[in-house]
Structures are given as C-alpha cells and as structure tokens.
C-alpha cells in the first residue's frame, strides 16, 4: 500500500507565508512567538544597566556560571537573555522591550544550542487579530560566535557597500564585530527584498520590528 503523502511541508509553507509577506508589509498573526533582544549597537554601560534592571525582576540563574545559558559569556548575550525573560514575564507588551530604546522585538527565535530563549506568544495589547508591520530589519543573534560574525560580514560585504562600517564611516562605532555584522547583514537583507531567507545567515540572523539605527548610524 502506498504511504500517504505528508502535508506538513505544505502547511509549514503556508504558515511561513502568513508570517513573512514578501514584497509587502509583514503580518504577525496572533499566536506567533516574539522575543526581546538587545540592539547590537548598545553601549557597554547600557548593557550592564539592562542586565541589572531585568535581573532585579526575574530569575537570571540560567546566565550564571553553570547555567544552561552562561555561554557565550558576553554581556550582549546575557543582557538579551535577561531582557527577554523580563519581556515575557511582563506580558510581551512593546514597552516591556524598550529598555531606553535599546531593546528590539524579534520575530525569530534567538535560542541556540542548549540555551532556550523563552516565548509565551505574540505581542499583547494591540487589540487586533493580526498585527501588520510595515518595516523589518535584520540583526545578528546574540549568541553568534566571532568567526561566524566575520563570515557574515565577508559574505554581505561582497554583495553590498559596507563603507559605513569602515574607519571614519557613520556606523564604524561601536567597533565591535556584533555591530558591524548586524549592519552588513541588514544591508544585504534590505537589498534582496527583505525575504526571510535573506536574514538566515546559517541560523545567526534575527528579523526585528524596530530600526536598530542609532545616532548618525542609519540601518
């Protein structure tokens, strides 16, 4: 007897298309998970402030030594993890991921390896069954290792003009691989039509709903 054809791939495609409307506005259907991550351009002092604030409200044992999310032992990962816990705990309102404009709501799961970023559902409080988002950006996953960041920069800058992240450019500061990779990846994402696959980067890209640009640095 022939085996029945699975409908899972087709259903997965339909779900993906409902989340990512290529060539138009992105629509977030109720039930789609969201996460809060830190803007890659965030300064060290702000990362510490966000980490302290979030961990004063939620348990951050997972990012302490020996915890499942201690590695990579970076402030940007630890701050993102704590900020997301706070965002989920407070009910996933947009304001719960503000953190003095240093938080970004992600439509992509920041989890990596054994470290799971919690998500209980979509953005609350909009009063509609579907939240339409007119613009999206691509940033880098907080757990991405340096060699992958550099590979993402190299790949993107082979396709787009990365002069803003070169010495003297408007996005050179802060001079971190995380910032430079996010800028280059987003430029590639925008130039290729903002398709979900254009922000994959071997699982290291995140699609976010707020402009990561800061000061004179425009994403």
Model feature map: region roles:
Residues 1-10:
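Bacterial N-terminal signal peptides that target proteins for export
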Residues 2-3, 15, 21-219:
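Folded extracytoplasmic luminal domains of secretory or organellar precursors
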